[in-house]
Every structure is written in C-alpha cells, then in structure tokens.
Amino acid sequence: MSGPLEGILVADFSRVLAGPYATMLLGDLGAEVIKVERPGHGDDTRAWGPPYTERGQSTYFAGVNRNKTTRAIDLRTPQGQAEARTLALSADVLVENFKPGALERMGLGYAELAAAHPGLIYCSITGFGAGEGRDLPGYDLLVQAMGGLMSVTGPGPGEPTKAGVALVDVITGLHATVGILAALRHRDVSGQGQRVEVNLLSSLLSALVNQASGYVAAGVVPGILGNAHPSIAPYDVFATADRPLVIAVGNDGQFGALVRELGAPELASDPDYATNPARVAHREQLKARLEALLAMQGADEWQRRITGAGVPCGPINDLAQAFALAESLGLAPVVTVEGTPTVAHPITLSQTPATYRNGPPDLPSS
C-alpha cells in the first residue's frame, strides 16, 4: 500500500533534529527523502553517542533518519553546489536549517531556485527568525531558556529546568511538517510553490498555549509550580505509602469522586475546596491533606481505586515501562527497519498508513 506522499521528492539539507524529524515524518508518509551530508563527516548527530545501534550508528541519528537515502555533497565546492542545485531543481520540497544567508551565497537560496522552479516548496528552519535574530544560534536549550519554557519548568522558584528532551526542536519539526503539507495542498490547487519559514522561538511561544495566552490576554507572567497545573487543582504528583502517583482532577465532579474514594467526602463541600478556583487558591494545603490520606496505601492500590472511581490517575513510568504500556495497549510503538528498532510513526491512517522502507542510512564513502 502506497503512502499519501508517494511521488513527492524531498531534498533534505537539514541537520541534527528539527529538520530531520520533519523529513522523516514525510518519508514515513511515502515521500522519497534524499539527505545531503558533508563527505566524510555527515550529520553531526552521527557522532552523538553512546548509545549506539547494533549497526554502530548513534541512536540519536537513527531516531530521526529512517526512510531516507543519503548523498555526500561538499557544498563548499562549485561542483558540490552544482550537484546540490540539480537535486533541488528536481525536488518537490527542500528543507534546510543553515544560518540565514548561507545557502544564498552558494546559489541555493529560495529566490534563485524558485525562479527556475516555481513549484518548489522551500522550508527554512531557524532559531530566532531571519530578521533581527538571524545571528542567534538555534540551540534547543538556548531557546528553552530565552523563550520562557524554563521559567515555568522545575521543582520550584529559583530552580529553572529544561525539558528532558529537545522538545522545542521536535515541536518546530512538527510545525515545519504542517507548513510543508499546507504548501503542497496549495500547490495542488494553484501549481505554485512557496517558502515555508519556521523558527524555534515562535514554535515554543505557540506551544506554551495556556501560559502564553495568560500573558498576552491578561498580563499574567507565570512562575514555576513544579508538577502542579497553574489553572486547575488537584493536578499534581502526590506521595503515597511507597511511591509517587499522578492525580489529574479536571472538574468538581472528579474532585468529589476522588475525596469519596479517599474516605474524606466532606472535603467536596469545604468552602476552601468546593470549586476549582478555591482549590487553586488553596492548592498547597489541599495537597498536604490529600497526601495524608494517600499515605495509608501504596500507589498500586490507590491507582486501582481512584481509576475505578473515574478519576484520571497513573504511575510515573520510566521509558521501559512506558513502551511496555504501549505494547500492552496494542499500540505497536516499535518498528524494526533493516535491523534497527525505531519508534513507530505516531499517526494511524486507515487508507494510506505509514510505511517503513529504509533504515537509517550509513554515510556514503564519497
């Protein structure tokens, strides 16, 4: 069964994570992806190990580069630039994350290529845009810090913390994918290609959703709340007799069900806790009262009982446990491609599902 993007050729000039993640998603959906790499060196993430796959590739590289072939092209030479131009002019989509202006100096900028190939969709990924922020380095950690994510993440005030993965890169890769698909749809109708531009800072600000909306619409600058939610309570990690448990109450009915199961139904009518705004205002004392009740049993027993009462509740899993959970639910989270286990494409399409045709490519000798 062919994928929905069969017949689309993607020239992938991107490196590291945001761009390669986007192009892998396109490849999973059937596009042919040709990854351009520096001869003898390749994508920097080829050297980002351990850990390594059984084939000796860094798992970082392998995680975002399946369903691609690779081509070694030295973009510093006229011959390499000519070869890259030929590839670009044959492609439907070009994806790049060079510093603004770099590809223009090689004769591979959008304006020059679009003049020769009006149907080309040219996706540029930067850290802070192509204007005043063009010279700022687009590193995920830097954007997490400068873009406000670390200011709302961490155990408490004065302890800003980054996310455990390069989340901004991943979100930006998703935005790039959406932009490319929208541009392909427009080309289907009009025959015209266009430039797609995404940047890490704008992607992060968009992904901050409710926190960002609270600032732009109400002027509220949020702070660090640990694992708590700024707008609803109780919605946090709670200690039990043996290990932590997540409880996520989203409305008054769930709160009533929770406290009945904990043996303290009177809390549902207490003025300090009867409504969500009241619970948010008294979140710390509420957490202390709930943890005193939760201390009477272990996490497994409480999860069984609280979930049975219709209240969202669950353990804090490590990755091994998370993948085991997905397997137990029939989600098939792992697919092995040419001997390399990779995380399965997350979107299920009933008529044109993702396909897995090539494992992460080895760097060609020349």
Model feature map: region roles:
Residues 1-42, 85, 97, 115-116, ...:
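Acyl-CoA thioester-binding alpha/beta core of soluble enzymes
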Residues 33, 71, 196-198, 313:
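Generic structural signal for residues in well-ordered beta-strands
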Residues 1-189, 289, 336, 358, ...:
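N-terminal helix-loop segment corresponding to the beta1-alpha1 unit
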Residues 74, 96, 198-201, 247-249:
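Active-site-adjacent beta-strand anchor residues
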Residues 59, 204-206:
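Substrate-binding strand-loop-helix patch
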Residues 187-190, 264-266:
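Short helix-capping/linker segments at secondary-structure and domain boundaries
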Residues 157-165, 188-204, 223-230, 271-274:
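Conserved Rossmann-fold dehydrogenase catalytic segment
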